[in-house]
Amino acid sequence: MQNKISTINYDSLDMLNHLLDISDEFNVSCLLNSNKFSHDKYSKYSWIFALGSIDYLSYNVGDKYSILENFLKRNISEWKFTYLSYDLKNKFENLTSNNIDNLEFYDLFLFVPKFIIKAGIKGLELEINSKVSNEEAINFKNTLTEIRKRVNKKNSISLSFKHRITKEQYIESICKIRSDIKYGDIYEMNFCQEFYIENTIINPIEIYKKLNEHSPSPFSTYFKENEHFIMSASPERYIKKTGSKLISQPIKGTAKRAHTDDDARIRNKLQNSIKERAENIMIVDLVRNDLSRIKSSENVKVEELCEIYSFPHVHQMISTITTKINNKLSISDVLKSTFPMGSMTGAPKIKAMELIEKYETSKRGIFSGSVGYIDDKGDFDFNVIIRTLLYNAKNKYLSLTTGGAITYLSNAEQEYEESLLKAEAVFKMFGGN
């Protein structure tokens, strides 16, 4: 049986907020929100919201990979939504993850939704899985008619985060990483630190709304999987497949925008920064190598090198690398060669991941992993989980992780301040610290 597809005649933003409000009634849900950023020529939708599950897979590294592949084959003609933990790396390489983990997400969670609402150029479209009963389908459609106009709530949300490591510990680690670079073990490494709150009860939907209002981003995500929540303002695409074309768009290089004539100078300074360009090009080379490892990959090329994209609060240096692959290649084949993304590891990739485990104190989990969809034709689109709040409602634990690329030219004090600056943008948003 085919899924039932119909159009919905409501304002897109009103519907999006309504769906967020009712999403808590489902055990699983996923919002992928581009916030109407027009610069992304590869984006097909303004937003997609998936609710409920017909089938799902909770997967950890110790499980057989065939379990994942069988799930994908069983649901080959279905839409699927997923999160991927950074620690899925341990399935593809001889690596480990033994640092503290208070979030306890699965290494991979994948579900086939009951309902999908897509906001595209033709308006709103509702797709109901063929396995949903007529009664449940009618009830869901009725909930959509109960849409309410947006009310701009000014609820006060106060969050006060603790630092997982001290400034002295951070700087000591940077010095050791620079030593590893000096002796040729690596060229560059992404080093991160965690900020956290224990014994806290939050409303993840309201947190996401405030995060997205303050920092609208092209790969924004809200994901609920039972007691686990992802609230992300990600600006970065990990990988996208459209037909036989794969696209990867790593970010390396960020500058805070100014609301004055000085903004153009800041943009040009980023564009011409030797340090930022060097970091970006190193990751481009790593991504090119990853894409070339994919079975049937050919004609790997850099379509954009160190281009500057401007967002409401920051300018970002983004490169675009593409390749041609066999159209029938699945996401599992692509993951084996490219995950985790090079922008969140360093180069050489495996050695950088070994040193990340050595110097960082928290298990990354979903941070620097990915959220995305696989459609009914096998095309997919995945983001990079950065600028993200992660929450375990059962453990009452909220986490934020920030970091940056470390090279031999890095100044430990400056790197610490940059990492703190990224965190403080969230702290100030929620009136804490």
Question: Can you annotate each of these PLM segments?
Answer:
Residues 1-433:
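Extended alpha-helical targeting/anchoring segments
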